[in-house]
Every structure is written in C-alpha cells, then in structure tokens.
Amino acid sequence: VTNSKYSFELMMTIASRTDVSDFYKNHKDEFEIIKNSVIEEYKNSEICYNLTEYSYSHSDEKIQKAISGVLEDQKEYIYCELTHIKFKGEFLYFYTPNETRYIVFSTQNKKPEMPLYGDKIIYCHVLRKGWYYCESE
C-alpha cells in the first residue's frame, strides 16, 4: 500500500489542475515518487485478477468481452510492468514498456479526446473506494 500522500486521489487532483509538461518540469522528483508508488502498489496482480473477475460478471457483454480479451494472459504485463505516467487535463495515463498499451484513469465519467496512440486502451474510472467501470477499445 502506498503512502496516502501519493494516492490516486492526489494524482487525479494534480492531473486535473496542471499542464502535463509544466507539471513534469516542475515536479520531476515528485513525479518519480508517484510513479514508483503506483508500481509498488500494483506490482502484485491482485488488481489484475479483480478486474478480470469483474469483467466476467459485467452485464454488458461487449464490455465484458473487450476487457477479458485484453487481459487474457496479459494481466501482469498490463498492470504490473507500468513504466511511466503522463498527465493530460484531468486524465492520468499509464503506459506499458513498449507504449503500445496504456491505461487511462479518470475521476470523471467520460473519456479523453481521441485519437491517442496505442493499439489497446482501457478506460478506468476511479472512485474513492476503487474501480467501478472499465472499457477497452
């Protein structure tokens, strides 16, 4: 578990109030701490499996299929080998090592502007107590 100082809520607040480049330039050390905290918190696969289980019970077949398809045999790769984070507006982007897959966390029930590069995307809308909706496109 990460220090609450570097919680998702804090990152969402930062992401919603700052420009990406300005934030990175002015907060490089803090950026690294946040990134490492997230990686530390999710380096075990619990969240990966929880999300997979959620997808199987989701009532929307299209979303269920999309999530399970993306996560099949790749849960740890997607969630446990995240290498860096990018902020843009109110959205928080996690990129996987080769940057072909990324995960978007948002505190708002909406999607970021498209297009964004990457062949797979998972939108994860985050509430205070955790995940409540994810969609892959």
Predicted regions and their residues:
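Extracytosolic and intramembrane catalytic regions of membrane-associated proteins
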Residues: 42-137
